Every structure is written in C-alpha cells, then in structure tokens.
C-alpha cells in the first residue's frame, strides 16, 4: 500500500526520500494522489498541488492544477464532497499547471443553472495570460525542452480561465465560517498570491515554496524576483501557520517546521543575491559572477532546499539580468557575428572538424564534460550534418544529463542529446537554419 501524503511528508522532512526521481516535486510522481490532510482540507498532488477547503457553505479551491489533471481533480473532489458546490478558486499565479483545472466545475455550474466559481487572482495575472496567447509557439518550445516533452505530443494552451476578481496588494473574502486572506508577493512571478486561512492556521504559498531550491533562475523563462521572494517568505513565516500546502510537493505540518522551511529558503535567496550584487558592484563580468557565487554549506543537507529543479547558477544569472540587463560584460558579445560563423572560424584555426572532435572526446574521457560540450557545439555549428559530430554530441549530453540533480539541467541536456540522435541541434525549433547577418 502506498504511503499517505502525510506519511510521505514526514519521511521527506526527515530526509528519508528521493526528491530527485521518485517524488520529484515538479513531476506527476504520486499518481494524482488525494487525501484529507486536515479536517475539511483535501490536497491533490500531481505536477502541481491543489487543495480544496470545505467552508461549510461550499468549497474553495487553492489553485486548480493543469488541464492534464482536470478530470482527475474533479473526480477526487467529487468523491470527497459529492454534494458541495465549488464556489471559489484562488490562482496563486498564472502558470498553466495551476490555472487550467476548472473546466468541469464550470460546466457543472452551467448545467445546474448556478453561478460559476468566482476566481480570485492578482491584477497582473490577465496580462500574463495575454502574453501567453501571443507566444504559444515559444512557450511550446521552451517547455518541450524543460520537461523533456515530445514535440509531436505537446502543445501550449491558447485559451485561459480569466479571473473574475483581482486585487493589487491584499484582499480578504469570507466563505462559510472561514476567512481567506490573499497577499501579493513577487517571486517566481510578479503576480504571486499567497493565501492564509486564520481559522485553520492554513497557509497556501503557491510556488513561493516548492520543496526545492526556489525556481528563481529558470533559464528559459521571464524575470524572477529574488529579494522580493525572500520578503514574502518571511511574511508567511510570521503568520503562525500550522499547515502549509506547498505549490509543488508535499504539505508541511507544524509551526516550527514551517517557519524553518520558509526562513531557510529566504536566507538562501538573500545569500545568492547579496553575493551576486557584491561582485556586480565591482564591475566584473557575468563569467566571474556565475563561477564565484556559492551556496552556503549550512543549506547543503536541508531536504527542502536541494537543487532538484532549478540550479543555483541559474538564480545568479537571473539576479544579474534583473539588476544588470542582458549584456554579460564581454565586448565581443555586444554585436556578435552569427555563432555558426564563429564556430567555422575556430574549427578552421584548430585544424578541422576531426581534430576538434578528437579533442572533445579526450576531454569527455577525462571527465571535463563542460569543455567537451563547448567544442562539440562548435563542430555541429560549423558542419550541421556531420554524423560523427552528432554522435559525440549525443554521448556528451547524455552523460551531462546523468550527472546533474537539477531536472531543468538534466532535461535540457537530454533534449540536446535526443536532437543529435536525429541529426539536429534542437527538436523544439521549427526552423533550424543558421543565422546570417552583416554588421550594421
């Protein structure tokens, strides 16, 4: 028999669990398990977590999951409270794994002639939905890479359930005998909402807490807000919550544990941003910054702060982008020649493709996969149809994927390996023609 959600939460708090593979917080590893984890509170765990709160006068959903979970969520909620209407939902932010699960609840309301659930969200959420509608191709490509999704099977959604009521800083509503306090914070997104229900001492942080190093650096996504994130975590820690419903992964039970998890996460974020800004204030290049910022040792063994999704170096890059813009400080990167042209020049200087491939293979054999990656990319850029170059590229990136804990890094490397197996650099790109340009 599978462990209950509460039992799994206890195991993972004590460091007795596999958050890299078996119970990764951003993967459907619990087979859409649902459980009443506190009186009147059902938690559904899949890629993202959803909770339903029974107010005594209807249900309130805290997030709604993705479209891929919508039927399962509906069935679990209906099995738990078959006669209770879903009257409201709170979107913690605009990401599609949190906002696309209301369809059957809306349809149920329509069929019975009552109002649809009222959706609460931050005032910036609709703008993000409109951004998504303008960038469906881009978001399909980057998520295919990030999650290892087959391009032929994954499409980015182009319709969204827009909120009915939005707020700017704080909003409180009551339902039944319960109070839902909505607070704005900036973190993974600029439209984050964390919710506190004081009567239950119940905290819903959304993706401000995900049982991992925060998703504060994601290499393909829009700006994250590291210092603001830390502020929101400390504000949540001050609530005195006894149950925290993580945006991904498992709940945390007990006020002391919740305070520890939130403040440790805030301290980690503060450390990364402080170190990054100290180096930036010396006027150094991004290359120095990403290789000199370190994660303090005191966080190394905390089970809820492992780099199983994002990576600390990605967070450093995001801090740089927020305070320093897109330029990395290297003058030749300001108005560069196309990469394929650069690669061809370097390969020629090195004595040709075969010599570069031989050196890349030796580096890989010696365990220097980072440098091997740089060299093999030059060969594929210089001669895109070179079979041996793609064969070596496949091998190098397969090895890089296996050596990383971060699933973002693993999946991006694995995507490159799969592409080279098919003689391509990128399976998600629908146009792989090399860039050509003249200097203006």
What are these regions (language model features)?
Residues 40, 53, 63, 93, ...:
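Divalent metal-coordination and catalytic microenvironments
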Residues 2-10, 104-155:
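Binuclear metal-dependent hydrolase catalytic cores
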Residues 34, 57, 68-118:
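Active-site metal-binding motif and surrounding structural segment of the metallo-beta-lactamase
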Residues 42, 90, 120, 165-167, ...:
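Hydrophobic/aromatic beta-strand patches that form the interior of the parallel beta-sheet core
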Residues 1-22, 138, 238, 251-440:
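Accessory terminal helices/loops
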Residues 28-83, 194-206:
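Conserved beta-strand hairpin/beta-sheet module of binuclear metal-dependent hydrolase folds
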Residues 59-60, 66-68, 127-184, 228-240, ...:
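Metallo-beta-lactamase
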């Amino acid at each position: 028999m599978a462990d209950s959600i509460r039992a799994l939460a206890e195991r993972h708090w004590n460091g007795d669990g596999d958050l890299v593979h078996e119970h990764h917080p951003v993967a459907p590893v619990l087979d859409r398990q649902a459980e009443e984890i506190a009186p009147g509170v059902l938690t559904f765990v899949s890629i993202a977590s959803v909770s339903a709160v029974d107010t005594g006068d209807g249900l309130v959903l805290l997030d709604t999951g993705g479209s891929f979970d919508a039927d399962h969520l509906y069935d679990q909620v209906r099995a738990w409270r078959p006669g209770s209407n879903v009257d409201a939902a709170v979107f913690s932010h605009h990401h599609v794994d949190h906002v696309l699960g209301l369809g059957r609840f809306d349809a149920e309301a329509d069929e019975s002639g009552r109002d649809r659930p009222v959706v609460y969200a931050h005032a910036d959420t609709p703008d993000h939905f409109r951004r998504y509608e303008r960038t469906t191709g881009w978001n399909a490509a980057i998520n295919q890479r990030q999650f290892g999704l087959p391009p032929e099977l994954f499409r980015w959604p182009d319709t969204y359930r827009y909120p009915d009521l939005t707020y700017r800083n704080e909003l409180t509503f009551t339902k039944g005998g319960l109070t839902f306090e909505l607070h704005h914070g900036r973190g993974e997104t600029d439209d984050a909402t964390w919710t506190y229900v004081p009567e239950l001492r119940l905290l819903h942080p959304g993706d401000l807490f995900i049982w991992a190093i925060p998703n504060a650096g994601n290499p393909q996504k829009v700006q994250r807000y590291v210092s603001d994130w830390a502020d929101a975590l400390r504000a949540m820690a001050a609530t005195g919550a006894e149950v925290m419903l993580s945006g991904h992964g498992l709940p945390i039970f007990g006020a002391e544990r919740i305070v520890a998890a939130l403040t440790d996460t805030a301290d980690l974020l503060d450390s990364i941003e402080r170190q990054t800004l100290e180096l930036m204030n010396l006027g150094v290049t991004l290359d120095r910054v990403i290789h000199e910022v370190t994660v303090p040792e005191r966080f190394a063994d905390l089970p809820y702060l492992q780099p199983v999704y994002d990576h600390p170096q990605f967070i450093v890059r995001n801090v740089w982008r927020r305070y320093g813009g897109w330029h990395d400080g290297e003058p030749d990167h300001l108005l560069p020649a196309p990469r394929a042209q650069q690669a061809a020049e370097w390969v020629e200087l090195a004595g040709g493709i075969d010599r570069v491939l031989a050196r890349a293979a030796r580096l890989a054999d010696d365990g220097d996969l980072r440098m091997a990656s740089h060299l093999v990319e030059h060969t594929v850029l210089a001669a895109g149809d070179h079979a041996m170059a793609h064969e070596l590229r496949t091998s190098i990136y397969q090895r890089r994927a296996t050596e990383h804990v971060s699933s973002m890094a693993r999946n991006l490397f694995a995507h490159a390996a799969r592409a080279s197996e098919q003689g391509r650099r990128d399976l998600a790109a629908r146009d792989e023609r090399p860039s050509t340009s003249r200097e203006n």
